[in-house]
A protein has these predicted regions:
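Cys/His-clustered metal-coordination modules, chiefly Zn-binding fingers
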Residues: 117-190
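Short, solvent-exposed loop/turn segments enriched in Ser/Thr/Gly
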Residues: 34-41, 88, 138, 144
C-alpha cells in the first residue's frame, strides 16, 4: 500500500451492532499518489473470545449530493483473527476516481470455523458523538494518563464506553482497557 499513503482520511463508525462478535471500527479513505484514485478500506475488530475465520458485509459508498457510487457485498475469507485483533484495513473494498462523502456498512455473517453468527436481522444502534474536551482538560488528562491524543470526554453508557481517545468499546467486548490506546477505563473515570 505504499503508493496509497499520500492522502488519508480516517472516520470512526458512529453505530454498532449489539451482540455481534465483530465490531465495525472505522473507514479509511486512501488517495493514490499516482493514480489519484480513492480506495475505501474498512477496519473491524474481533471483540469475542474466539478466533474469527470469515466476515460477510454489505456496504454502500456515497458521493457528492448523496449519489450512490457503489453498493456491494464484500467477504473477508480465510482470515484468522484472534480476540482483540483488528482486520480489514489492508483490503480496499472499492476504488474510484470520484470523491466519497460517506460509507455505510452492514454486518451480515461472521464465522468461527464452522459456526456462524447471522447479524443482518440485528438492528444497528447509533452511537452518540464523543464529546470534545476543552484544551485545559485535554492537557490535564494527557498528563495524568501519560498519553497523547486524549481529546474526548470518557463516557460510560448501558451499551458500552467511550475512551478519551475516541474509541467506543461495546459491552460485548467486556474490557476495562482500551485496545487502541491502552487507557484504563476506571482510571479515566476518576
Amino acid at each position: 500500500r505504499p503508493e496509497m499513503e499520500r492522502f488519508k482520511r480516517h472516520t470512526r463508525a458512529n453505530y454498532y451492532t449489539p451482540g455481534s462478535p465483530v465490531q465495525f471500527v472505522c473507514v479509511e479513505l486512501l488517495k493514490g499518489e499516482l493514480s489519484g484514485e480513492n480506495a475505501v478500506c474498512l477496519t473491524f475488530k474481533n471483540i469475542s473470545k474466539v478466533t474469527l475465520t470469515a466476515l460477510e458485509i454489505h456496504f454502500k459508498c456515497k458521493g457528492v449530493d448523496g449519489i450512490i457510487l457503489c453498493e456491494d457485498a464484500f467477504e473477508y475469507r480465510e482470515i484468522e483473527v484472534k480476540p482483540g485483533e483488528s482486520f480489514g484495513m489492508d483490503d480496499a473494498v472499492f476504488v474510484t476516481q470520484k470523491a466519497i462523502t460517506s460509507v455505510d456498512v452492514v454486518l451480515k455473517n461472521v464465522y468461527s470455523g464452522k459456526k456462524v453468527v447471522h447479524l443482518d436481522a440485528i438492528k444497528r444502534v447509533r452511537l452518540p458523538a464523543p464529546r470534545r474536551l476543552s484544551p485545559e482538560l485535554e492537557k490535564a488528562l494527557e498528563s495524568r494518563m501519560n498519553r497523547t491524543g486524549l481529546k474526548y470526554m470518557p463516557q460510560v453508557f448501558e451499551n458500552g464506553w467511550y475512551c478519551a481517545c475516541g474509541s467506543f468499546h461495546p459491552k460485548e467486548e467486556d474490557t476495562v482497557y482500551c485496545t487502541e490506546c491502552g487507557c484504563d477505563r476506571i482510571l479515566l473515570q476518576n
